[in-house]
Design a protein with these regions (language model features):
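Alpha-helix-loop-beta-strand connector modules within alpha/beta enzyme cores
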Residues: 102-118, 166-180
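His/Asp/Glu-enriched, well-ordered alpha-helical/loop segment
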Residues: 201-232, 284, 305, 309-311, ...
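Histidine/acidic residue-rich metal-binding segments in metalloenzymes
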Residues: 132-311
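Metal-associated gating/positioning segment near the N- to mid-region
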Residues: 45-115, 132
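Short, surface-exposed connector motifs at secondary-structure boundaries
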Residues: 86-90, 116-121, 146-147, 225-233, ...
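Divalent metal-coordination and catalytic microenvironments
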Residues: 8, 21, 26, 47, ...
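Histidine-rich, glycine-flanked metal-binding segment
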Residues: 1-53
Length: 457
């Protein structure tokens, strides 16, 4: 059966254009104006924007953290992703300390296979470095994993500068790409100790012990290590002006640096941590913390100028009951917020509709660039002949109010509660099959594991 999406505006990384899309099976056959409806079922998308299926390259489903497990597993999290127009997620396989990379990959396949409703892949977390892990890197490429992650903070996961240098050298041999969580762990620990010694324990202590300059310091240190190795790296969830300055300096030196940010750093500000209602403030605890309005504006400018390549979510959801476990100890509040269900509508509302970015930029940061960065292009990330028929149908006139009660994810709150979006996602198609209709997730979708190639950006 052929499908003909007729009457819409197709959005690519270069911008919007009027075109029809002809689909057969799982693939796109043609994209051009006025395709005749011969032997095809017509999907009327008059007045709609048609995006490639969004790619969220930074999710944490079914993750054990802070003595609990994220509210969303791969089943609920992927359904929430589909509702938000995301047809592909890349989650993080996380071996426990002392385990092999194979152990971590095996566990994440057990969590996701047969449960994930959208297509999916994995990054591999490197939390240690030795000869065994170095040998395993080769095996990961054979398994379709071409991207990795390291942490400069969190005692259970962080890796030192020497190990990071050695790991990056190995990844350079293989043509791999690595994302790094950049915060200065030592200074954070000292600031936390100072707060506790002073008897301070409010949620506001979270951003005050993880300041922007200590994120920027870690970004600068990472980039100097990467410069020594001569390898491009990804700065994940970039939050502030100072970090952007470090990145700009590295690019001026001739380095290739890729930058990711997230909706929470674009549309929220740090006033959320100073709410007198402890639980309301705790809902926004994530690391790095949400920053100031000036940082939001700087990130939007960076997207517009092409200095930020991707907008992911760092989706790491918890219930209010789980957040309450940190009452009395701000460092024990589980860090993370839900985001996969609202990302596309927030970027359109606060970016495109407010004329901070264009439709082409929205397509680049949500679909095209993540596909290229993580070895999925042109199968994913573009509406073109031969690509997977992953299609997001966006109605720019169907405004709606974000409410936790309407969400399909497992968290019982939404950090954007009450926000009014300009337009909404009405349909989502995954490999030529409808998975969202009239804004509702349809049952029965089963995602495919996606082995990935090398970076193409």
């Amino acid at each position: 059966m052929r499908l003909l999406f007729k009457g819409g505006t197709v959005v690519t990384g270069k911008g919007p254009r009027r075109a029809d899309i002809l689909v057969e099976g799982e693939k796109i056959l043609d994209v051009c104006r006025d395709i005749p409806a011969i032997g095809a079922q017509v999907v009327d998308v008059t007045g709609m924007l048609l995006f490639p299926g969004f790619i969220d390259a930074h999710t944490h489903f079914d993750l054990d953290v802070c003595n609990t497990t994220t509210a969303d597993d791969f089943a609920s999290g992927s359904r929430a992703a589909l509702r938000g127009g995301t047809t592909t997620i890349i989650d993080f396989a996380c071996p426990n300390k002392g385990e092999t990379l194979h152990d971590g990959l095996r566990l994440w396949h057990e969590k996701a296979d047969g449960k994930c409703a959208c297509d999916y892949g994995f990054h591999m977390t490197i939390d240690d470095w030795n000869e065994t892990i170095a040998r395993e890197i080769d095996d990961m490429y054979a398994e379709g994993i071409s991207s990795f992650k390291m942490y400069m903070t969190y005692p259970a996961m962080m890796i030192g500068d020497e190990a990071m240098y050695k790991a990056l050298k190995k990844l350079k041999e293989k043509g791999g790409i690595c994302g790094v969580h950049c915060e200065n762990a030592g200074v954070i620990d000292a600031l936390i100790a100072e707060k506790k010694a002073a008897g301070e324990n409010g949620v506001y202590c979270h951003p005050e012990t993880r300041p922007d300059i200590m994120e920027a310091e870690a970004v600068g240190r990472l980039l100097r290590i990467a410069e020594q190795v001569d390898i491009p790296v990804v700065i994940v969830y970039t939050t502030n002006i100072e970090a952007l300055d470090e990145i700009a300096n590295a690019r001026w030196r001739g380095q290739k640096v890729f930058v990711e940010t997230c909706p929470q750093y674009l549309v929220l500000d740090d006033s959320v941590y100073y709410n007198e209602d402890w639980l309301q403030a705790a809902k926004y605890v994530c690391s790095p913390p949400i920053r100031k309005k000036a940082d939001c504006n700087a990130l939007w400018r960076a997207i517009r100028r092409g200095e930020v390549q991707t907008v992911s979510t760092d989706h790491c959801s918890f219930t209010t009951a789980q957040k309450l476990a940190g009452r009395g100890n701000f460092t024990a509040i589980p860090g993370g917020i839900p985001g996969v269900e609202t990302r596309g509508e927030l970027i359109y509302t606060f970016g495109v509709a407010k004329k901070k970015i264009g439709l082409g930029a929205m397509c680049r940061v949500l679909a095209e660039n993540p596909a290229k960065l993580y070895g999925l292009y042109p199968r994913k990330g573009v509406l073109a002949p031969g690509s997977d028929a992953d299609i997001v149908v966006y109605d720019p006139k169907a405004d709606h109010v974000i409410r936790a009660e309407d969400m399909v994810g497992a968290a019982d709150y939404n950090p954007y509660e009450g926000f009014v979006t300009k337009g909404s996602i009405r349909q989502v198609w995954l490999r030529g099959k409808p998975v969202v209709s009239s804004g509702k997730v349809l049952p029965g979708s089963v995602g495919k594991y996606l082995p990935r190639g090398k970076c193409q950006l």
